[in-house]
Amino acid sequence: MMKILLTALGFCLLTQMQAQPDRWQQRVKYTMNIDMNVQTNQFQGKQKLEYWNNSSDTLTRVFYHLYFNAFQPGSMMDNRSLRQGNIKRGSTPDWDPRVRDRIQNLKPDEIGYQKILSLTMNGVAQPYKEDETILEVKLTKPILPKSKVVFDMVFEAQVPLQIRRSGRDNPTTKVRYSMSQWYPKMCEYDYEGWHPTPYVGREFYGVWGDFDVSISIDSKYILGGTGYLQNANQIGYGYEDEGVKVKKPLGGKLTWHFVAPNVHDFMWAADPDFIHKKLKARNDLTFHLLYKTTNATAVSWEKILTDADKALPFIEKTFGAYPYKQFSFVHGGDGGMEYPMATLLSGPGAWLHEWLHNWYYGMLGTNEGEYPWMDEGFTSYAEDRVQAFLDNASGFPYEGSYRSYYALVKSGKEEPLTTHADHYNTNYAYSIASYSKGDIFLAQLGYITGDAVRDKILLEYYRLWRFKHPNISDFIRVAEKVSDMKLDWYKEYWV
């Protein structure tokens, strides 16, 4: 009898392990219509959000992110930055130099905000309350397991002066609008529960879904970002099909219509002076580049396209296939910063790192707050490998990460990799842990398993967990299966 029970238990455990990549996930579909006023830097928005509760839980409330509200004097993001400014590394303040004390000095027409004007679920008005960057909605009727509801929202927003990631009018790049985290975004609900994480300028975590976005804006503006432009032959600006003579609608505005399938965020940027170039990397993939020559030459910008084309076969062979039909490198007010199918770049130098984020942030989608090193570190590792390929270099590609990590250890400021991204005591410790120590995690894994096996692990991890929000235990489980080695000790010692 004991033998039968043990056999049954073993079968159940094996079945559970094999089924792990099919872990349930919520699903969303956004349909949004935006009307932008480039004189006031404000926009009106309508959002229809179809929400699938694929969990076995009954949901009595939901949460939205309202990221723009962080850019107001006295916000949590403002207070955190001021606190970090009082922490010194030598004589250098620990604050992000892009943020510093700038939020507290914003004028009323320079702050960011997102105001909810109305919200219904299945046509019934819902009570809600704002707490800075989080909107809590206590539902009048619960969302049952395995059911779908529809939220309709009317909102208005003001684009903040460029400080961090999203914003307007960076004086160096002179890009007018860098529109990330610009819409009320449903928080993620997963096997751990809700993740209504206040925004203090760090990481993101989103629900997989489809986006249908229409943006009405001054007809002189050129847009780039996430998604496929649906009305390219009416818009023009280099998006139109070859040979098409564009006939733009009459009036002072154009409506740009984008769709983006199976992504967890949507970014766009806009400027009247963008130069738009594109390169067909293969039959089903086009690279777009939108830039200005305000802080870098056209030659340095356009080299991105040829280098990306050269790197693509190596990247896909080593880390997995890129599944979308386009990728856009977009000059922005802050960056590099990664988004699905696109990146914002303040200059051409960070293009490779930000593009490679689309494998780890974009397609694997680990919770960046809990595991920032599995995004930044794995991306840094991939960047080291790809840059060595592009440079035809034979040296040790991870040297920079090792040097940075050694410096952190010697400083006495190292914190465990298990620290939540928002809870590191210093920005310095967070940065080195997330980028350098995460990079070294994969480099040393190759020392343990052998480089060829480590590469097989990365491809199998991508194959099994693409679009499924994996965590570190999921990665270790794949690594153990592929290598036929016990690796929990490595996770425990290093993480």
Annotate each predicted stretch with a short phrase.
Residues 340-401, 458:
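Zinc-dependent metallopeptidase catalytic helix centered on the HExxH motif
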Residues 76-89, 156-211:
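Glycine/proline-rich low-complexity spacer/linker segments in large multi-domain proteins
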Residues 185-193, 201-352, 381:
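Hydrophobic helix-coil surface modules that form long, contiguous segments used
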Residues 431-495:
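Amphipathic alpha-helical substructures
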Residues 18-44, 488-489:
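N-terminal, polar/Ser/Thr-rich
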Residues 52, 92-172:
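A surface-exposed beta-strand-loop module
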Residues 47-49, 64-66, 147-161, 211-219, ...:
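Short, hydrophobic/aromatic-enriched beta-strand segments in well-ordered soluble domains
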Residues 376-444, 448, 465-466, 482:
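Acidic/His/Gly-enriched intrinsically disordered linker/tail segments
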